[in-house]
Amino acid sequence: MEVGVLSMRYAKAMIEYAQEKGVEDRLYNEFFTLSHSFRVQPGLREVLDNPVVSVKDKLALICTAADGNGESSREFVRFITLVLRNRREGYLQFISLMYLDLYRKLKHIGVGKLITAVPVDKETENRIRSAAAHILHAQMELDTVIDPSIEGGFIFDINDYRLDASIATQLKRVKQQFIDKNRRIV
């Protein structure tokens, strides 16, 4: 079965169950932390794919990755147990990402990423967040990243759109224009 189809089925079932129980917000936080753990700790996936590691140890590892030292919700533990029992732990990263997407659609939350060459103050960040929320008619989750390689300006990703106003991109365009003009001369 395809990764996307399987992940969507599990995530959709989980969000419907969470809505019935009224715990979708808590599960969102747990799946958000779990997906972040997969991103920053690539060895987590390798351990979950290892057949030598017991299901009990995998469950403890996943709960720790999702909540740190806190206690995982009963619904989260039951869901992870189901995934482990069906030997779908290799899909857990994708399931958690699908759950996040479904939750954001359900709660009308947009995702934005602001990349700048220098740190942005909180006031500017809040103005960007509120402007994007007004345009999308949704709440915004805004992640700010500092990347000196863009040399100045900013890159703003919002949902599936990108506004690139970086100096590095503008310089690349000017360079490409010079190259194109020189090709015509030769």
Curated annotation (Swiss-Prot):
Keywords on record:
ATP synthesis, Cell inner membrane, Cell membrane, CF(1), Hydrogen ion transport, Ion transport, Membrane, Transport
Q: Describe its partners and assembly state.
A: F-type ATPases have 2 components, F(1) - the catalytic core - and F(0) - the membrane proton channel. F(1) has five subunits: alpha(3), beta(3), gamma(1), delta(1), epsilon(1). F(0) has three main subunits: a(1), b(2) and c(10-14). The alpha and beta chains form an alternating ring which encloses part of the gamma chain. F(1) is attached to F(0) by a central stalk formed by the gamma and epsilon chains, while a peripheral stalk is formed by the delta and b chains.
This protein's GO cellular component annotations are:
plasma membrane; proton-transporting ATP synthase complex
Membrane-topology annotation of the record: Peripheral membrane protein
Entry's NCBIfam families? ATP_synt_delta, PRK13429.1-3
GO molecular function (one): proton-transporting ATP synthase activity, rotational mechanism
The cellular location(s) given in this protein's UniProt record come to: Cell inner membrane
Alphabetical list of PANTHER family matching this protein: ATP SYNTHASE DELTA CHAIN
Q: State the HAMAP family in the record.
A: ATP_synth_delta_bact (MF_01416)
Which family is it part of? Belongs to the ATPase delta chain family.
What does the function comment of this entry state?
F(1)F(0) ATP synthase produces ATP from ADP in the presence of a proton or sodium gradient. F-type ATPases consist of two structural domains, F(1) containing the extramembraneous catalytic core and F(0) containing the membrane proton channel, linked together by a central stalk and a peripheral stalk. During catalysis, ATP synthesis in the catalytic domain of F(1) is coupled via a rotary mechanism of the central stalk subunits to proton translocation. This protein is part of the stalk that links CF(0) to CF(1). It either transmits conformational changes from CF(0) to CF(1) or is implicated in proton conduction.
Lineage, uppermost ranks: Bacteria, Pseudomonadati, Bacteroidota, Bacteroidia, Bacteroidales
| Top-level taxon in the UniProt lineage | Bacteria
Which protein are we looking at? ATP synthase subunit delta
Q: Which GO terms describe its biological process?
A: proton motive force-driven ATP synthesis
